């Protein structure tokens, strides 16, 4: 398969702000056009206080900050902005309902053609604030209509992101990746939380019919490796290994189709 356009979203491990593995994968796939919308510190879920979503809608890329605007949903919106013709209102329609981003927030740039591959690797930072604590509420959210998805949990946010992208990019092969294992005292990155996040991502991938790359177990970057190779952010040796692993997973999936 000839991959003309590759688009990725995620956190510091995928982002060019830090590790840049998303762009490394794009180059290995020989993609002619690349949009890496990932940001360091990004969370999968929108931030919230109780049931109130406190994440602002913005098209401005956060500079590797642990802030409420630095979330997957805003990365998706920046992808939509790039796909929307220059100067046009950013619109998309799901279940017969049209959604739009107000022009005062931003308009289309027309800088991206329809992607062949979309890769999303995000969840490591979920839980670093009380406002984005991870929980497996997939069962509660999986049957909700698009308009009812609050994005205040990982499942809801991923379902919203995938359904948005499936609508706007119907021909794209979408891949969700489970998180890498880490070696850190931070509770939200420990094994139990990693496994919880992995379960949510796998369930969303199955529900939406997209592909799942199990980086948690398949990449080789387990807790013992992480201890001496970057703890959270893989060192140069392991960045290469993980990029090779992800590339192989994408290629083997595409060539089977």
Regions from the language model: what does each represent?
Residues 33-35, 173, 209-211:
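Conserved beta-strand segments of alpha/beta enzyme cores
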Residues 15-19, 145-156, 191-195, 233-240:
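Soluble non-cytosolic domains of exported or imported proteins
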């Amino acid at each position: 398969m000839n991959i003309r356009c590759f688009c990725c979203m995620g956190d510091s491990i995928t982002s060019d702000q830090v590790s840049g593995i998303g762009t490394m994968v794009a180059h290995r796939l020989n993609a002619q056009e690349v949009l890496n919308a990932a940001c360091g510190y990004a969370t999968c879920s929108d931030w919230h206080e109780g049931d109130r979503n406190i994440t602002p809608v913005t098209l401005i890329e956060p500079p590797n900050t642990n802030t409420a605007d630095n979330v997957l949903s805003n990365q998706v919106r920046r992808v939509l902005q790039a796909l929307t013709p220059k100067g046009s209102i950013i619109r998309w329609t799901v279940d017969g309902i049209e959604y739009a981003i107000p022009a005062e927030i931003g308009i289309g740039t027309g800088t991206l053609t329809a992607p062949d591959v979309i890769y999303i690797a995000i969840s490591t930072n979920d839980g670093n604030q009380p406002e984005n604590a991870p929980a497996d509420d997939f069962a509660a959210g999986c049957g909700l209509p698009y308009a009812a998805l609050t994005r205040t949990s990982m499942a809801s946010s991923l379902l919203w992101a995938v359904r948005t992208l499936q609508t706007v990019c119907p021909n794209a092969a979408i891949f969700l990746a489970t998180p890498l294992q880490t070696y850190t005292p931070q509770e939200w990155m420990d094994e139990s939380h990693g496994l919880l996040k992995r379960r949510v991502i796998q369930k969303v991938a199955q529900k939406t019919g997209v592909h799942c790359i199990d980086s948690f177990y398949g990449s080789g970057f387990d807790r013992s490796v992480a201890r001496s190779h970057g703890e959270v952010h893989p060192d140069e040796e392991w960045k290469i290994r993980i990029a090779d692993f992800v590339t192989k997973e994408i290629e083997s999936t595409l060539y089977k189709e």
